[in-house]
Structures are given as structure tokens and as C-alpha cells.
Amino acid sequence: MTMAQPRIRAVPTAATPEQPTVQLKGFTRRFGDNVVIDGLDLTIAPGEFVALLGASGSGKTTLLRTLAGLDPIGGQDVTTPDARAVVFQDARLLPWKKVWRNVALGLKDTNVRARAEAALKEVGLGHRLDAWPATLSGGEAQRTALARALVREPALLLLDEPFAALDALTRLKMHDLVLSLWREHKPAVLLVTHDVDEAIALADRVLVLDKGKIAVEERITLERPRQPDARFHAVRRRLLSRLGVEAPAPQPAPAPNSALLAFPTGEVVL
């Protein structure tokens, strides 16, 4: 879902390596006497994948809405690209429009169907162009939302807990798809999530937001695809500790003949 941007200073869609895609300097957001974001500094480089963790009420959604252009900024120093797109937890498809028309919303070219078809093929839904949204599974709906976002070639892709409502297997498949699309299209990405394992598996850098401030910044140097090995668990324990959650002890490796596979323990509810 592409957002208009009337109040935020924009940078060109193709940012240079020296020019960040996102930059906030001392950004503050209040609701009455409640300070939700408190003097926050944030920079996201072109093509960087950043994950944002934090307890409910820490300011994650407010920050994402600011970057999406949905909330006023009151003349503060916020820089984002013109080309932005958001994928929400709810796919937000229009039920009276077929799948390809949902993807093509807002496109003005004469070849909008061809562009929508290409985007849907890229997310594995080329066979569902003329389907109605009500017939899609949860995973298919989120794939459609991704296609709708990426068909516009955004310089900044904002992901607001897009996998939270999916079952575990579908979520893992969506992780692989998002990484593949990120490598292909090279947008800067900000993923808001409650799932520590998801953040470590996907991001170049993980931030923890606490009381409106960035309390933790962890650069993830593990090779992709990331496995739940000792190094993964070490990063996980550090992040959970800063989130005030006691990490469970790592599970022993399965016996050589065991049919069980070791996976991360999944979402941590904060």
C-alpha cells in the first residue's frame, strides 16, 4: 500500500551510498502528556534490512506510521524517500476487486495488468490473477500485499508484523520469499516484529525500542541462510536480556539418527 507524503522531506528514490534512505534527528512524538518517541535518532542506509523490536507501547507503530507519512511530524527533521510502500499484518485487500486489480491499485500506466501479473508471478501467484481475495489463504493474501508493495519499486519497504497471523510453516516460507525479493529489488527495509528469532533470521541490524528510545543496536553478521546454531542463540540471548525476557537454555542437538530438526523456539510475546 503506497503512502502519500505531504509533510516529510523527501530524498531521491535512488539514494547514494553517502545519502541515507531514512534519517531522523532528535525526533519526538507526543500524545498529550505521553511522550511516545523521545529524541530518537535513526539512519537506514540504501538496501539495508533493519528489524525493530520492542514491547507493546514502546513506540514501534508510531515510528512506522511516521516513516509511512501517516502521522504529522510538526516540522521535525525526518527524511524519507518519495517511493515508499507498507505491508501490514492485515493484507488489506479490497474484496470487490480481483487479485490483480488489488496489486495494480494506483498505477497509472497503460500496461498495469502486465505489471501486476509480473509482480504476482514473482511472489508465486501468477495463477491467481483473476481470483477474488476471499478465496485466498492467509499466506496468499500476504503474498498479494507484497506484490502490491513491490510493483511500485519502493526505495523503502515498511513491514508492520506482516507474518504474525500466519502459521509457523507459512511464516518460514514468507521469510524466504521476503529475503529473495529484498535481494532482487534492493529496497531499504524496516521490519516491525515481536519475534526475536524472526528479526535475527532476516535483518542486517536489529534495534530494540524502549520508552521511545533506541536502547539496543545489534548488527547481525551471521551468514545467510541463518541456522539456529550457537552463534544464533548467543545473539538471541543478548536481545532477550535487553527485552527483559529470560532466554530458555539451548536445546541439545538431535541424535544422528533422529528425525527431529532443531528450529528456533519462535515468537516471544512481549
PLM feature spans:
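Conserved beta-strand-loop-alpha-helix hinge in the C-terminal portion
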Residues: 211-238
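A short, proline-enriched helix->beta-strand linker immediately N-terminal to the Walker B motif
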Residues: 151-155
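The feature captures the beta-strand-to-loop junction immediately N-terminal to the Walker
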Residues: 53-55
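Helix-to-loop junction immediately C-terminal to a conserved catalytic motif
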Residues: 68
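Conserved ABC ATPase signature
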Residues: 132-136, 140
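Hydrophobic anchor residue at the start of the ABC signature
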Residues: 146
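Conserved structural motif at the start of ABC-family nucleotide-binding domains
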Residues: 22, 37-39
